């Protein structure tokens, strides 16, 4: 009989108690024999008919979710014991695919034959079969657990009176034959971009059929590219009636009732410092040097108290959670919160009283965090500045200094603290990247008119440092109270990534210190060492590729990139849901310290689910914006076909190499088939192509002259050729 303390407690509470999924899985994994339902009933002391029915329902749900398998002899077993895995299908335009699982680090290979049984995006149950001749572990489709039910965007076509749609996403490498349409087919001309809903259980074994549910347009432009991205990545972009109704009850101005239990900081000259085109201001800062013989600085970081307006489980909260993050496209913002909240009520606009959550910090003369405290307050921003304005004032711009002469003393205080943080910055202990970013100048149609380099000045870095300090203080606070919260985790690179990165460095005459497990400081030292090399950006890019992606999770695993033992996101609750969650937890803990009623406390299960979802929405936003930017780049490069440009090899693959064009910071492909002077093979360790006869090489960092051959807008591809072979 399997009984734990949880079961004893739950049996007292519920008459028809049944075991948790975790208990069932533990028993199935540890028991060597196949287990029938009768045996499970005996193991868990289940006697009543109600309990047996409830257990049967739970087992069926676990089977449906791929957690267990029901065998022919009417017994249950875990997938692991049968070398069976659950995963998501990732299609490829050439017909084959991969299975992405949580069990394996590398994706499992799905052959063209196996891909006929499923489509991109399906969640399937698969059997792991032996490695193929290329050494890849492959999978055999057993069952589709959750078919991909997303809407697919594609181009409408007609051939021999047959109507079909060719998906924009090449991972769906099939035609969708149109059965019917919610919109009259007569109104849809050939070449129009439409949205299709697939018929249930669609596979390539038979014709894939679907229904047109929306017409997006025909003439490609930035706005249509955004529409496609929103639907391709299933991003919510409309507000429900419930949200609109809730917004009606939120007042734009705060009153004395809202000030209750808040510290009045309206007299302090807080500033917001952001980009020129920023519309939502969720953070403001103020600092001053300590007096009365004390050494160091006081820094106030005021963050908009979004959690005051967005209560848990309301329509606004559910909509914000679903979106997870704001998405910034060139001509459109898809905000996490409606504009009444994001750019009005919660935005720290100049000369407007706003509710805030404060992180007040005491810093040493070296900018180190000594003590901190969080509290609710009301502030009034004394000015909205841009990074460039602050930087110019710090450097003595006469016109701006005169314009802001009343605030000049406080701006110079920021400058003094900035110099300290720049010298002793906490982020310098971690891996500090100096990326060259492209700045796209758009015309009236939101198409690229020109491209320049976006230079980050000291004002950018100062605000970033202040936000990092506030995030560190917030992480320490929640960690101290051991409350379930979302940490921002960045795991150290895995062993294979370190080995591969070191192989590249070796070819370049460089090395990474730190032995088998290098620390962040070892990477930081490497970046300092190569900072003057012409191939600095290229090496930095390879380093970035070797790193893992940061994620949100209640398990505090630290932030490798910043070299921190714990880290949370606290400073952007208007545009990031994890920050809103952190605010709620902090406010709950502040009330707890005062023995007041609790605000809102999450349990571990809730936080885990929210973390997984927010990590996904962050990746989704990145992919959607990348899609639109790639389209804009291709649209711009169409005008450059035939031009000869200089660039640097930014990546080398088995099918060619990518060249980053110096003038535009855009990558294009020189396909291996265009290298006709020799037969080239790929050196995966040295990341280079080598000529078999000539021994000519094309390596990362090589400078070349290339000609723009063609641009494929649909596939977002720019093809180049060598202008002059070596």
Curated annotation (Swiss-Prot):
Identify the domain of life.
Bacteria
Its subcellular locations are:
Cytoplasm
Hydrolase as UniProt keyword: yes
Alphabetized SUPFAM superfamilies for the sequence: Nucleic acid-binding proteins
Annotated InterPro entries: CSD (IPR011129), CSD2 (IPR040476), NA-bd_OB-fold (IPR012340), RNase_B_OB_dom (IPR013223), RNase_II/R (IPR001900), RNase_II/R_CS (IPR022966), RNase_II/RNase_R (IPR004476), RNase_R (IPR011805)
Tell me the ranges covered by the S1 motif domain, including all copies: 642-723
Documented EC number(s): 3.1.13.1
> Reaction(s) catalyzed by this protein?
Exonucleolytic cleavage in the 3'- to 5'-direction to yield nucleoside 5'-phosphates
Main location class: cytoplasm
Q: Where is the RNB domain?
A: 262-590
According to its UniProt entry, one GO biological process term is: mRNA catabolic process
Q: Which UniProt keywords apply?
A: Cytoplasm, Exonuclease, Hydrolase, Nuclease, RNA-binding
Offer an example of a GO molecular function term for this protein.
RNA binding
GO CC annotation, single: cytosol
The protein's matches in Pfam families, at most eight in alphabetical order, are given as: CSD2, HTH_12, OB_RNB, RNB, S1
Note the subunit structure. Answer: Monomer.
Entries under HAMAP family matching the protein? RNase_R (MF_01895)
Q: Which family does it belong to?
A: Belongs to the RNR ribonuclease family. RNase R subfamily.
Q: What does this protein do?
A: 3'-5' exoribonuclease that releases 5'-nucleoside monophosphates and is involved in maturation of structured RNAs.
Q: Report the protein name in the record.
A: Ribonuclease R
Which species does the entry assign this protein to?
Buchnera aphidicola subsp. Schizaphis graminum (strain Sg)
Species lineage: Bacteria, Pseudomonadati, Pseudomonadota, Gammaproteobacteria, Enterobacterales
